[in-house]
Amino acid sequence: MNAEDHTPELSARERILLTAHDLFYSGGVRATGIDKVIAEARVTKVTFYRHFPSKNDLIRAYLDYRHERWMNWFKDALNRHGATNGQRLNALVPTMAEWFNNPIYRGCAFINTVSELGGVLPDVLEISSRHKQDMTNVIAELLPETPNRLAIANAAAIAVDGAIVKAQLDNNAKLAALQGLSMLLSALNMQQ
């Protein structure tokens, strides 16, 4: 993905951020140099550094943008897959299948970035923790209000994260991840 793929009406900052998003997600944060982002966003170094004084600033903006984008998709996908009907927790399986089968799927941007930079950039841990908590909160909203609602939501979120990591391995792993997630969610449904 490069800046040509983004509409010319976008500001330089938006082109930089969208280009970084695509490059960081597809190739990793550490492996993607600022010069590549600058070239593909078709901006000058001066323009880049005016908007993002350091790569760390760009990483934070990338994670914030990814969080907003992914959460909007997640809520929408859950609704499309039946989260508003009876077995609401079961909507997680087709939602994850939709994501896993996307040709650009490369796992969770937050898990990936924490594994790359969590020990050296504390903001990555903070943003990623917020993302995972927000995901858990959305899952909790699928559940009836019972005393163990939060415990079930936390367990479901952990199962989702495990499926996300497993699905990165290959196509066979995607199927196994979805089957395992389905089994775990069925067990959690019995706890309600």
Q: At which residue positions do the language-model features occur?
A:
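N-terminal intrinsically disordered/low-complexity leader segments
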Residues: 1-11, 192
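Helix-turn-helix
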Residues: 2, 15, 19, 23-57, ...
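Alpha-helical DNA-contacting segments of helix-turn-helix folds
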Residues: 59-66, 73
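Hydrophobic alpha-helical connector segments
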Residues: 61, 75-102, 153-156
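Amphipathic alpha-helical packing segments from all-alpha helical-bundle domains
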Residues: 68-71, 87-90, 120-144
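Secondary-structure edge/capping motif, primarily at the C-terminal ends of alpha-helices
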Residues: 81, 117, 167-171
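Amphipathic alpha-helical segments used for helix-helix packing
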Residues: 101-123
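Hydrophobic/aromatic-rich alpha-helical bundle segments in the mid-to-C-terminal region
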Residues: 124-130, 145-192
